[in-house]
Amino acid sequence: MKKVGMHRMKFLSPALVTGANGFVGGHLVEALARQNVKVKLLVRSTSKIPFKPTTNMEICYGDVTDLESLRKAMKGVKVVYHLAGILRGSNFSSYRSVNAEGTRKVCQAAAENKVKRLVYVSSLSAAGPSTEKGPIDETTVPKPVSFYGQTKLMGEEIALSYKKHYPVTVLRPGAVYGPRETDIFEYFKMVAGGLVVIGGADTQKISFVYVDDLVDAILLAAHSKKAEGKTYFVSDGQSYHWGDITAYIGKALNKSYVTLKLPLGLVKMVASAGDFIANLTGKSILPPIVSSDKMKEAQVPGWACKNTKLRQELGFKPKVGIEAGIQKTVEAYRTAGWIR
């Protein structure tokens, strides 16, 4: 199928983006603004916007757990891009309150305001891991292994239950990387420092997608009739070991490094200690990728998915391969002063 160019697309406007100050949300907001879409940014009052707002952006202070703030933000909105969620919580309830019940409130407010379309950006974690047999696809029965994945799946089910009110599309991206990303950035930082610490065996195969390609997929999903009521995986179509990724990062940085493999049991102990301190103090001392919940995702064969359905039905064609994407990301990190 021939891809519909973004320049030929009639964009729905105004749009509301939840999680607009986040990594993917910020890139989506900027892409919409470039297309002269009026964008409402739902952010908390304490949040920092990682880019300079333009005249066609409106900042709406609120929270996905606050129905009244959602109702107010959605007045006059035609399309909702729901990206808000939490990657790290203290228990199952904390994940559910945002990823599931927050999604319910977003969908309810959208229905009350008679929006025309909703795209829910979920996660590969909602589907569960791939196996030794290879990448999973949309026919695979979801078997999430973490609280994060379980509650994102709950969010998917809630969003799709509102399709009688407006068309809904669910996207499940693999690992997303690019400028301003802060979790996978830890690997870039380790390579830059010359020491890469890996917990357990480097045997998992993982699907990645560059942030600009994910934004393209989100916009395609929001403006395609074929996407209504459907779920799609989003990736660059390949899968990689973490060793491959660190090698590409080393090449982009022109840095040599040493890899230190720690027993998974030790990493789990560190993650548990970090969770305990976070629950006690309310402050996290470890990055989100090092948590007890994420350790559940580290003990499976892989996180690889196919993008065949997205390509065939919506004409999705990723523009940025892994090496080029990592090079772009390194350049952005250096420009921002995050790494040398």
Predicted regions and their residues:
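Conserved C-terminal active-site "lid" loop/helix of NAD(P)H-dependent oxidoreductases
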Residues: 211, 247, 270-279, 285-316
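N-terminal Rossmann NAD(P)H-binding glycine-rich loop of SDR-like oxidoreductase domains
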Residues: 15-35
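Amphipathic terminal alpha-helices
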Residues: 2-3, 305, 309-313, 317-340
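NAD(P)H-binding glycine-rich loop region in Rossmannoid oxidoreductase-like domains
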Residues: 61-101, 109, 124-129
